[in-house]
Amino acid sequence: AAAAHVSYRPGLRHAISKGAPGIALLAGEPPQPGERPEVTFARSVGWATSIGEVIQGFRAVAAPVVDSAGVCRAAVAVVFAGSSDVSGVADFVVAHAKALGSDL
């Protein structure tokens, strides 16, 4: 049995400013006045992280997928339970986001 079960009903949404995937998407865009500090930080390091912003007890790490024209098209994310070190996960999502972006 799984330690946790996560599912979304079709049509369920949350604000783009919540959670690592949304933060990564915003970080892939030019800076905006009044943006969350997490977006500014994600833009500087190339990835975003969040803990419990969308689902309590879950952490996410995400990176923007930027195409060859420099346009952010998507985000790659890994969501997991717990609060383990994210550096290895961050390296993974950044590498895969770059690989996807180079194919666009």
What are these regions (language model features)?
Residues 21, 58, 71:
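Conserved catalytic motifs of the protein kinase core domain
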Residues 14-16, 50-53:
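Short Gly/Pro-enriched turn/cap motifs at secondary-structure boundaries
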Residues 48-50, 63-65:
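Cytosolic beta-strand hydrophobic patch enriched in CBS
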Residues 26, 61, 79:
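Residues in well-ordered beta-strands of folded domains
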Residues 1-31:
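Amphipathic alpha-helical effector-binding/dimerization core
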Residues 56-64:
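A short beta-strand signature within small-molecule sensing/ligand-binding domains used
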Residues 66-72:
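Flexible loop/coil segments at beta-strand boundaries within sensory signal-transduction domains
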Residues 32-40, 45-48, 54-56, 72-104:
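Juxtadomain coupling helices with adjacent low-complexity linkers
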